[in-house]
Amino acid sequence: MRLSRYFLPILRETPKEAEIISHRLMLRAGMIRQEAAGIYAWLPLGLRVLNKVCDVVRAEQDRAGAIEILMPTIQAADLWRESGRYEAYGKEMLRLKDRHERELLYGPTAEEVVTEIFRASTRSYKDLPKNLYQISWKFRDEVRPRFGTMRSREFLMKDGYSFDIDQAAARHSYNKVFVSYLRTFERLGLRAIPMRADTGPIGGDLSHEFIILAKTGESEVFCDQAYLDMPVPPPSVDFDDVAGLQGVVDAWTSHYAATDEMHDEAVFAEVPEASRLSARGIEVGHIFYFGTKYSTPMKAVVTGPDGSERPVHMGSYGIGPSRLVAATIEASHDEAGIIWPDAIAPFDVALINLKVGDGACDTACAEIQAALETAGLSVLYDDRDERPGAKFATADLIGLPWQVIVGPKGLAEGKIELKRRASGERETLDPVDLPARIRRL
């Protein structure tokens, strides 16, 4: 993609309303634009990142045996009355009526809808377990939306829901998602720490938040530093191995970890002083087991092995891809701009032509772009008629993992320059060696 033809409305000045670094950088890098309080348009660069985050989330959900569906955003109020949550949810839920005066709502979550889908189509324990998920836009009318896409009113959410015959089976489904989330965040270049959490309006008696550490995090967290080096299960992890999966979850919940809401100073004091870590953190995922909280009032039942009907045991599991984009920036940036992990960078390579119009530079850049794309790498080619300093500033701001710098001096010696954005390391090499060099690193 040539930058001269791309839609990248970069801002030179930081908008005054942007309070945290991710919001500032997403606006400056032309990733998003605000349309109303807490509501954003995703522009091409931001959408590429968002789609890549969704691809990783989707791949790990599928690996764990979850099945993707898509449910309506506009939901019937009667379903929420049936579960008992219509009045309890409060003003965060946007309520409306259609032309026939039927009461509807803009779904902030989908436990009721997925339970209705399940009960209408599943009758026997032989059809269990099931884990259904979707990736869709949600709306919660926050009193004070702030921090850009970190706490917006409209947001993209992966919400999953499991159905099992009993508590033991439901706990295995919970563990599957627990491990899949560890793998998801690892692939996104994030170290997420699971912490016991309050179940809030979702309900239930078992819940974990997944928290990444960041200086600008919204929550204070307390944990054992052992979490920073714990191994994440590999792609070969067997999600059907009940005991093995429970062992992974036990290992990842054996050390102290709590947000300020759940913090117990006396228990934390038992952690060796050298291992205690107090920091700021950002919630990037939340999982719940809530038993029969929804299935009982909504009569989501199956026939068990003994022939009697029983309500299914359920769990729900959330990751916010739009929030994850901002959280990644909070955890990975410097004074010059964003530093994208390879897995979700909008492009792999920023190709910088230092002298547009120079025959040798133009030809070399065209050949390099073709070679990189043939090797499966995505390239954003800065072919604008701008000063080198402006091009370097743009490349650093948008944070692509690699910068390939082509100028007349280097080409006179048959060389180009390669820079790694994360480390700042530079090297010179022959253009023909470039694709293999990037692939190897």
Curated annotation (Swiss-Prot):
Keywords recorded for this protein, A-Z: Aminoacyl-tRNA synthetase, ATP-binding, Cytoplasm, Ligase, Nucleotide-binding, Protein biosynthesis
SUPFAM superfamilies the UniProt entry points to: Class II aaRS ABD-related (SSF52954), Class II aaRS and biotin synthetases (SSF55681)
Cell compartment(s), UniProt: Cytoplasm
EC number: 6.1.1.15
Catalytic activity: tRNA(Pro) + L-proline + ATP = L-prolyl-tRNA(Pro) + AMP + diphosphate
Pfam family, one: HGTP_anticodon
One GO term (biological process): prolyl-tRNA aminoacylation
GO molecular function: ATP binding; proline-tRNA ligase activity
Subunit and partners: Homodimer.
Role of this protein: Catalyzes the attachment of proline to tRNA(Pro) in a two-step reaction: proline is first activated by ATP to form Pro-AMP and then transferred to the acceptor end of tRNA(Pro).
Protein name stated in the entry: Proline--tRNA ligase
Organism, as annotated: Methylorubrum extorquens (strain CM4 / NCIMB 13688)
Gene: proS
